[in-house]
């Protein structure tokens, strides 16, 4: 099958067992909206999560140090989040979704983010010191749980 892709130009062979995308594949990739595809795949999972927990569920992507919310499924709980909306951006360093995305960065990319950041407190509880943010992100990596404890808004825990 790989030989057919090489023959068609979709895959380039650079050496023994070394392959990369050919021009047609690269052009096709440029036309693909990865975030939209991810949202389409993730929506059923988020619906189930919101249904089972009663809480609002989100899917976001990291764009230039900000979280862009691509999917928002409202929960049925009385205090389900009403703050967010699809297409909205929030600072990654203080939002639950943003912290999850930051925890998924490589160590080098996380350090770059912390080095270039101008972290502004949105509430008195917002973590803004790079050392505190680093520790928080490392804890998220360890536990798999990210919490925004009134860091974006005084009346919102995420």
Please state what every model-predicted region is.
Residues 125-158:
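Extended hydrophobic
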Residues 20-116:
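Amphipathic alpha-helical effector-binding/dimerization core
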Residues 5-16, 20:
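Beta-hairpin "wing" of winged helix-turn-helix
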Residues 1-8, 140:
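Basic amphipathic alpha-helical segments that dock to polyanions
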């Amino acid at each position: 099958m790989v030989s057919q892709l090489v023959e068609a130009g979709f895959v380039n062979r650079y050496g023994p067992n070394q392959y990369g995308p050919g021009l047609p594949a690269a052009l096709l990739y440029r036309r693909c909206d990865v975030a939209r595809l991810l949202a389409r795949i993730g929506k059923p999972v988020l619906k189930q999560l919101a249904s089972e927990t009663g809480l609002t569920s989100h899917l976001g992507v990291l764009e230039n140090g900000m979280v862009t919310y691509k999917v928002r499924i409202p929960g049925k709980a009385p205090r389900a989040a009403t703050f967010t909306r699809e297409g909205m951006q929030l600072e990654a360093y203080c939002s639950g979704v943003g912290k999850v995305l930051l925890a998924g960065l490589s160590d080098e990319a996380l350090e770059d983010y912390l080095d270039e950041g101008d972290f502004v407190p949105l509430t008195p509880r917002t973590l803004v010191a790079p050392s505190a943010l680093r520790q928080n992100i490392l804890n998220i990596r360890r536990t798999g749980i990210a919490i925004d404890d009134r860091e974006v808004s005084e009346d919102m825990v995420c």
